[in-house]
């Protein structure tokens, strides 16, 4: 059992109700927690979360369906389908042909974060920065003085002039949002509001010249990872704290990690689906854009779930 205390910050805390004797966890409980922490680490963005779930579903024998193809599904079959690479539906059909009921679990893949603006390059006082926009209901103060990396999806044109998309994750600290030194801001420990437009531009390093382009940095990173990139067309990127999930407390009764809202529910729903041995119909849906109202094609207010059920 997990009792959750969520703060919409760079790092959240969950209270664990797992320990049998208040100190030691069973091997199964520890294995489950290790899997959860690995899933969170591998999922810095909704695109990576869906890719992580796809990997586990493929290993479990699930077959991928495509919206552009005619579906041929069988009783007892196990399938999944994605939309925008950020929303996923996975389901197991009952052994009997007639579907009388379906057990469903819902979650969402997105979390509050700092997203990179379309034209983010800023040079100020000899330093290179990137402009960001707050996504979702985030606490802003905890984003300061963190080691930040960058991840998301990049759309490119390859050598054959085809548009392709790639996941990208720098997996190392490349930026930070430094706090102002106390002797320059004597009121820092009192009431202090954060202006996202002036206080949150992310620091990349010393100024890199007027011709600096984030798209060039993305292209170089993708090429270093074996992708053919002729031109970066567009991107959807967000910064994340590189600090790994950890069990903290004298008895390790707390799980501290980013994106617990709502990757925790995604992981619980996925593992429940994969571990189930029932012959009844089951479905897991993990939507995107919950943090901004779900009003999108891949959000919960969209038609994705209904179209899959139909």
Regions found by a protein language model. Give the residues of each.
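N-terminal hydrophobic/helix-forming segments and targeting peptides
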Residues: 2-310
């Amino acid at each position: 059992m997990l009792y959750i205390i969520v703060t919409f910050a760079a790092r959240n805390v969950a209270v664990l109700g797992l320990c049998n004797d208040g100190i030691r966890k069973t091997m199964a409980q520890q294995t489950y927690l290790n899997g959860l922490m690995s899933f969170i680490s591998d999922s810095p963005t909704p695109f990576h979360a869906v890719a992580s779930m796809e990997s586990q579903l493929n290993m479990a024998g699930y077959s991928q369906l495509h919206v552009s193809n005619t579906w041929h599904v069988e009783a007892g079959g196990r399938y999944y389908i994605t939309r925008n690479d950020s929303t996923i539906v996975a389901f197991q059909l009952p052994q009997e042909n007639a579907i009388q009921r379906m057990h469903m679990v819902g979650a969402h893949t997105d979390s509050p974060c700092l997203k990179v603006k379309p034209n983010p390059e800023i040079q100020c006082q000899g330093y290179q920065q990137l402009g960001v926009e707050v996504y979702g209901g985030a606490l802003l103060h905890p984003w300061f003085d963190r080691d930040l990396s960058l991840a998301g999806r990049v759309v490119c044109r390859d050598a054959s002039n085809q548009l392709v998309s790639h996941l990208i994750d720098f997996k190392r600290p490349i930026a930070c949002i430094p706090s102002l030194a106390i002797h320059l801001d004597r009121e820092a420990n009192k009431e202090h509001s954060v202006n996202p437009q002036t206080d949150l531009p992310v620091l990349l390093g010393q100024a890199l010249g007027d011709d600096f382009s984030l798209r060039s940095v993305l292209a170089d990173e993708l090429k270093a990872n074996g992708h053919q990139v002729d031109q970066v067309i567009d991107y959807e990127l967000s910064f994340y704290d590189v600090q790994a999930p950890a069990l903290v407390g004298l008895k390790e009764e707390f799980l501290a990690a980013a994106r617990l809202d709502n990757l925790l529910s995604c992981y619980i729903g996925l593992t429940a689906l994969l571990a189930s041995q029932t012959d009844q119909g089951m479905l897991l849906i993990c939507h995107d854009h919950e943090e901004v109202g779900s009003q999108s094609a891949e959000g919960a207010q969209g038609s994705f779930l209904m179209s899959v059920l139909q």
